[in-house]
From Swiss-Prot:
GO terms assigned for molecular function: lipid binding
Knockout mutant characteristics: Lacks mitochondrial fission anf impairs engulfment of mitochondria by the phagophore even if it does not affect the recognition by the mitophagy machinery as cargo. Does not affect reticulophagy, pexophagy, nor the Cvt pathway that delivers the precursor form of the hydrolase aminopeptidase I to the vacuole.
SS bond partners: none
InterPro entries: Mitofissin
Protein name from the UniProt record: Mitofissin
Bilayer-crossing regions: none
Keywords assigned: Autophagy, Mitochondrion, Vacuole
Organism: Saccharomyces cerevisiae (strain ATCC 204508 / S288c)
Family: Belongs to the ?ATG44? family.
Signal peptide: none
Lineage: Eukaryota, Fungi, Dikarya, Ascomycota, Saccharomycotina
Keyword Ligase applies: no
GO biological process: mitochondrial fission; mitophagy
Length: 73
């Protein structure tokens, strides 16, 4: 696998993990404690990372909600 292929693969994996964390937040209210991070820059990047997951989660729910293949119960 080329370097570009590996980067794409890792990027997609990171987005999936972030989306999973967003789903956990929505369903249980549990979120990572970002206050435990000492580095302010790292804390800001983690907030952005988690917000990306929230956006992907929202988009996925909206797409599935408007699809004929899914129904709400």
């Amino acid at each position: 696998m080329t370097l570009v292929g590996k980067l794409v693969h890792i990027s997609i994996d990171l987005v999936l993990v972030s989306t999973c964390l967003a789903g956990i937040k929505r369903n249980t209210g549990l979120t990572p404690k970002l206050e435990t991070l000492d580095n302010q820059t790292m804390r800001n990047y983690m907030k952005r990372y988690l917000n990306l997951g929230e956006s992907v989660y929202d988009y996925s729910v909206a797409t599935c909600g408007s699809s004929t293949y899914f129904a709400r119960k």
